[in-house]
Amino acid sequence: MRLHHLLLALLFLVLSAGSGFTQGVRNFVTCRINRGFCVPIRCPGHRRQIGTCLGPRIKCCR
């Protein structure tokens, strides 16, 4: 039963973070939801930056 509570809390966290997507991606969870990945350098190849992960130096690329 505790697992259900944890998953419900995680769902609320993800949904509340996704509601402000007009401001861009700002954490790992929303980066992954938006089919991105986090890198500590600039985005490789033809990928573009769609936000940041865990601070301004780690980019979310898609």
Swiss-Prot record:
Gene3D superfamilies: Antimicrobial Peptide, Beta-defensin 2, Chain A (3.10.360.10). One of its GO terms (cellular component) is extracellular space. InterPro entries: Beta/alpha-defensin_C (IPR006080), Defensin_beta-like (IPR001855). GO terms for molecular function: CCR6 chemokine receptor binding; chemoattractant activity. SMART domains: DEFSN. Disulfide bonds join C31-C60, C38-C53, C43-C61. Its main location: secreted. GO terms for biological process: cell chemotaxis; defense response to bacterium. Keywords: Antibiotic, Antimicrobial, Defensin, Disulfide bond, Pyrrolidone carboxylic acid, Secreted, Signal. It holds the Pfam family Defensin_beta. It is found in: Secreted. Neutrophilic granules. The modification Pyrrolidone carboxylic acid is found at Q23. Residues 1-22 form the signal peptide. It comes from the Eukaryota. Belongs to the beta-defensin family. PANTHER family: BETA-DEFENSIN (PTHR20515), DEFENSIN BETA 4A (PTHR20515:SF2). Has bactericidal activity. Active against E.coli ML35 and S.aureus 502A. This is Beta-defensin 7. It comes from Bos taurus. The gene is DEFB7.
